Amino acid sequence: MAKIIWTRTDEAPLLATYSLKPVVEAFAATAGIEVETRDISLAGRILAQFADQLPEEQKVSDALAELGELAKTPEANIIKLPNISASVPQLKAAVKELQEQGYDLPEYEDAKDRYAAVIGSNVNPVLREGNSDRRAPVAVKNFVKKFPHRMGEWSADSKTNVATMGADDFRSNEKSVIMDEADTVVIKHVAADGTETVLKDSLPLLKGEVIDGTFISAKALDAFLLDQVKRAKEEGILFSAHMKATMMKVSDPIIFGHIVRAYFADVYAQYGEQLLAAGLNGENGLAAIYAGLDKLDNGAEIKAAFDKGLEEGPDLAMVNSAKGITNLHVPSDVIIDASMPAMIRTSGKMWNKDDQTQDALAVIPDSSYAGVYQTVIEDCRKNGAFDPTTMGTVPNVGLMAQKAEEYGSHDKTFRIEADGKVQVVASNGDVLIEHDVEKGDIWRACQTKDAPIQDWVKLAVNRARLSGMPAVFWLDPARAHDRNLTTLVEKYLADHDTEGLDIQILSPVEATQHAIDRIRRGEDTISVTGNVLRDYNTDLFPILELGTSAKMLSVVPLMAGGGLFETGAGGSAPKHVQQVIEENHLRWDSLGEFLALAESFRHELNTRNNTKAGVLADALDRATEKLLNEEKSPSRKVGEIDNRGSHFWLATYWADELANQTEDAELAETFAPVAEALNNQAADIDAALIGEQGKPVDLGGYYAPSDEKTSAIMRPVAAFNEIIDSLKK
């Protein structure tokens, strides 16, 4: 039997799965397709790490490793929902919950090395054995033109800007080499006195692979940050920091610590020795510092110094004004790819402590991609907000296969312990890359393999040809890595028929301006980018165009011939879960799942000639468009339609479409009674689903909710369940 793998993940998409997956299973079965769940949730991955220490009845398999292997085969057809990229505080909370549920797990401090495997963004790099094709589906774009989301007005007097280093950072210190032959290199630190320390003893590289090394200077970073704290205060705007501490799990928490210490420079000048000795260096955020002060004898005195620092420093952008949670409280609370587009959409403002919006200084220390956001800000200051009813679209073709570029750098990122040099040394002793570094600098290496680069260029040409859109490679001539990539892109473009296609290479700043000039004219442009800009652009443009990145179609054509279908580019929405717990209303929009599912069925048609799967896909697309037009998407407000209601209406419209289509008589016959039953009971089922809302519920866990309790909450109406379950019989 053909098989689609549906991933069990975390938070809002996990809750939605309890409601949606039974519908998907029932419909898929009519095309001879089995839908199988694999658990790659944070809780599931933690338990898999310690399977050797758990009793037989508690053991779970390493589903992520299994899916990683499956992704390298032509059989792969995986629907991947958003999962938690865990920060240390999230990991500790999940471990505590599992311990309370009876799992004998060690404390984080006692098994840091093993837990490291589940911190940060560990899921996507394992599954992404292909490059990325993300675009706004036509149905969604059409819907937004009819029902545009709110866009904040921009003022020509806006004081909002990006602050970035521009020197002594990752961008400016980069060196890059294309390997002539396969080799295994060593990364080592040579101290000023000649002492050698091996940082990575064996790094195998393939012929044609691009290897980079770069570093950010700690001294330059500190000087830059002190200037920005002063600048925000002088300009009377919010101070905000925008990092990606989840994905860049080694470098960005260190940089975040520098930001916290710069903002509270006076506190660290007075109490720094004691704070650092207690491990309160800011790298886990202000919340962790406050928690740690309780254990210090003079904790109250130091807390008062922090309060004074907040009072005297520039106002901080807030994550939750009501609860006093600032931008600096938790490193994973403000994630650049979501926070910057949200700010641009909100008139260039962020929320202040009085719960009002205010202009902000967006501090993005490394200048590699900061210019993209500054370009959009300047354009909005000059030309006003974008208009969702007329604007063009910017789909993305992203290089990400086999842990390309920065998003594969964690195991090659090091905090430098002493002044000296870092060298990347070939097996014959040649030094390929060398940097002079100082204590505290952050040095990192990135790898980009040749086969993914070739596949990326091919995918860009294919998308340009199929869509008829111009395609622009975003490559920065000021960066050594991008200069090497430009050489390879030009070489591989020559292997393709590009006659009649508009393909060019621009720097990220030029490419941004080019794309937004065209957007304002209602014209479409494919952005062809590396891995980080893939991440940033597939939030930036969708949030401006569609109001959210969760409505993107995200396809990863796997290099071995399988398919990975990602549901939206947003996160796992912890606030949505909070609302369920408090008032049993799930506002998560499963549109991303609907779009991915249609593509997954289409993949079965294209690879296995399963025509029934093709009919399911087309009917699902039509049902999704109807769902949008009939305004059956979840509301944010309790007492109105939520995620469960949208699943009911999708099932109804999908059954209607299948009953009424003429391509497959057997499917039409199967779905006629289902459609009739759903339509006959529609008013009652809809009312019953809404009637469930308005009271607190117990999921039996947050990271590892109880299947029984959560299923009852997410499938509360027996009449609907019976109709769906009858399809499986």
Swiss-Prot record:
Keyword flag Manganese: yes
GO biological process terms, semicolon-separated: glyoxylate cycle; tricarboxylic acid cycle
Entry's Gene Ontology molecular function annotations: isocitrate dehydrogenase (NADP+) activity; metal ion binding
Entry keyword annotation includes Magnesium: yes
Binding-site residues for Mg(2+), renumbered to this chain: D337, D535, D539
Residues in coiled coil: none
InterPro entries listed in its UniProt record: Isocitrate_DH_NADP_mono
Pfam families on file: IDH
Task performed by this protein: Catalyzes the oxidative decarboxylation of isocitrate to 2-oxoglutarate and carbon dioxide with the concomitant reduction of NADP(+).
NCBIfam families, per database record: monomer_idh
Protein's name in the database: Isocitrate dehydrogenase [NADP]
Source organism: Corynebacterium efficiens (strain DSM 44549 / YS-314 / AJ 12310 / JCM 11189 / NBRC 100395)
